[in-house]
Amino acid sequence: MADRYENQPPEKLQGKYQAMVVCCILGIGSLVSWNSMLTIADYYYKVFPDYHPSRVLTLVYQPFALGTILILAYHESKINTRKRNLIGYILFTISTFLLIVLDLATKGRGGIGPYIGLCAVVASFGLADATVQGGMIGDLSLMCPELVQSFMGGLAVSGALTSALRLITKAAFEKTNDGPRKGAMMFLAISTCIELLCVFLYAYVFPKLPIVKYYRRKAASEGSKTVSADLAAAGIQNQSDLTDDDSKNQRLSNKELLIQNIDYAVNLFLIYVCTLSIFPGFLYENTGQHGLGDWYALVLVAMYNCWDLVGRYTPLVKWLKIENRKLITIAVLSRYLLIPAFYFTAKYGDQGWMIMLISVLGLTNGHLTVCIMTIAPKGYKGPEQNALGNLLVIFLLGGIFAGVALDWLWLIGKKNAF
């Protein structure tokens, strides 16, 4: 009787809203550590003024993230998703705590040694990011689109949250002795606590929600082997009978999935090439001096994060959601007009125009990302949705890596840039 009940769709999608809240928190946890690094970049610029922290740290982060997701996506169908995501969140927790230890051990002093240590911790962030993002998006892609949207929204919430906290801590500690360092340490301590919360939620709460159990059982019945440990954690055993019929459980290969969704993949790549060629390096080093002083870059980062958050929830408004594949491509390509707009605004415009441009960049980044991530998996079986989610994350991280590399081009012709 229990097994038959578990196979039925949950009444009125029971547990859906709890699952959406948990997914949002898990999304926050998958990016809060890295966003903390970006948001306290003003502190690292004071400690390491000659090493271009926002650009170098991002460039260190991305090869590890991209390399890891390539390996994990290739072996996606054989990987235990539960272990994968838990390892990722635990690695985030340890790495964020190590940033505090590193700063305390060096007493906030700069130099090449502490900077190499900082880069090593950032590399571990890259490993954790690829482990969690690919695992979570793949896992949620076999469920309802609202859960994917909530997770993607959580990524943006982490940015808005870290920006708000950074502005508060900067104001609170600005006039105190060693103020920027105290604010940064408080920041990292909060991030560590959030990561610990995510470990608990994913291990003990998320797998037991009725809607999550339903979709995972459905995926298992369609041939998915990645959800077995999650089902066991929810107290559901004896899944072998669900996956024995190989004729029903044949799935498209990764190559076939990629060919069918190549436009979505390339568009994700182009979205993040455009975004990361501007954010955050350009904002910290190429926007000049304005009335806001050293608050200027922080305000720009905060505006980007806030509008990115808004953009990830605008697809909930049905008439705003773009579902036509050609329209998505046109919207993605039109964002590249922002690059010359940023260049001329930095050179000739005032801070009001720059704030407007960064808001548009964030809004379109969030909106288009969620549109693609929620539309692409529709119509596929559970194992295919999981695989497609991982493939899309490859192109997303690839776009970030390419954008970070292109961001260095802004330094050409700038005095004392290197």
From Swiss-Prot:
Regulation: induction: By nitrogen deficiency and 5-fluorouracil plus methotrexate.
Pfam families: Nucleoside_tran (PF01733)
Subcellular location: Cell membrane
Key words, A-Z: Cell membrane, Membrane, Transmembrane, Transmembrane helix, Transport
Transmembrane segments: 20-40, 56-76, 86-106, 112-132, 142-162, 186-206, 264-284, 291-311, 326-346, 353-373, 392-412
GO cellular component: plasma membrane
Annotated SUPFAM superfamilies: MFS general substrate transporter
GO MF annotation terms: nucleoside transmembrane transporter activity
Phenotype of the disrupted gene, per the record: The isolated apoplastic sap extracted from the double mutant missing both NSH3 and ENT3 lacks the ability to catalyze the conversion of inosine in hypoxanthine; this double mutant is unable to grow on medium containing inosine as sole nitrogen source, in addition plants are more sensitive to the necrotrophic fungus Botrytis cinerea BMM but are resistant to the cytotoxic adenosine analog 2-chloro-adenosine (CADO) and to 5-fluoro-uridine.
Membrane topology of the entry: Multi-pass membrane protein
Primary localisation category: membrane
InterPro entries (alphabetical): Eqnu_transpt, MFS_trans_sf
GO biological process, one term: nucleoside transport
Reported tissue expression: Expressed in root tips, vasculature of roots and leaves, and meristems of leaf primordia. Expressed in flowers and siliques.
Family: Belongs to the SLC29A/ENT transporter (TC 2.A.57) family.
Function: Nucleoside transporter that functions as a pyrimidine nucleoside carrier in all organs. Has high affinity for adenosine and uridine when expressed in a heterologous system (yeast). Mediates proton-dependent adenosine or uridine transport in Xenopus oocytes.
The protein's name: Equilibrative nucleotide transporter 3
Record organism: Arabidopsis thaliana
Annotated gene: ENT3
